[in-house]
Amino acid sequence: MANHKNLFFLCFLIGLGLCSARRALLSSSESEAEVAAYGVNSGLSAGLGVGIGGGPGGGSGYGGGSGEGGGAGGHGEGHIGGGGGGGHGGGAGGGGGGGPGGGYGGGSGEGGGAGYGGGEAGGHGGGGGGGAGGGGGGGGGAHGGGYGGGQGAGAGGGYGGGGAGGHGGGGGGGNGGGGGGGSGEGGAHGGGYGAGGGAGEGYGGGAGAGGHGGGGGGGGGSGGGGGGGGGYAAASGYGHGGGAGGGEGSGGYVP
């Protein structure tokens, strides 16, 4: 009988030891899995934050790195949009937002990206891409399109209508300049001034009360002048056609 009791107690101890060992192994494997998952998630989050520059949504961060092929800026509701990438081949600018709208995008350097992004009322539009082949600006609220156009052989073209009391699109500059900006609806200043050393044309014409007319094309080529601004102020509704350096543009008041 004593032998049976000892054998039962021995089996009980062996079973208890096996259960304890199994529990320890399971808990250790679970903790390792949790640590591994935490490490992967942390690595992904850190990678996104660094790669995008402000994380998904852009926030108030100025996205896009400088240098060769800078990244694009993010979007952000109610925030300042992401900034453009600098360096050679800079990325595009940020998106729209609340108060200050689209970011001042456009990469500087050769092949600068376009600056997109319209803002709400009171927001600034997208910035233009600088450098050779710079891109155009975007639309906006109080201040409309960005001042596009590159300083090289790029066709600029800063398009975008402004909001109430807003400025119109910016002019395309550079050699072989691009077209001017669009009209600002009810804007104080209408179309931009398209200019450049090539055959850039200045489109525009600000509609609304007190709107200034379209900008003139010009440069060394045959840039056509912009149209006049409609609305209620004929005195300021002129398009200044022609440009410096022998441009053949023409502009006038268009009711």
Curated annotation (Swiss-Prot):
Biological process GO terms, please? cotyledon vascular tissue pattern formation; leaf development; leaf vascular tissue pattern formation; phloem or xylem histogenesis
Question: Where are the annotated coiled coils located?
Answer: none
Q: What happens when the gene is disrupted?
A: Defects in venation pattern in leaves and cotyledons, post-genital organ fusions in all aerial organs from organ primordia to young expanding organs and glaucous and rough leaf surface.
GO CC terms, sorted: extracellular region
According to UniProt, the tissues expressing it are described as: Expressed in emerging leaf primordia and young leaves.
Localization (cell): Secreted
So which residues are the signal peptide here?
A: 1-21
Region named Disordered: 63-88
Q: Which UniProt keywords apply?
A: Secreted, Signal
Function text: Involved in leaf vasculature patterning.
Protein name per the record:
Glycine-rich protein DOT1
Please name the source species.
Answer: Arabidopsis thaliana (Mouse-ear cress)
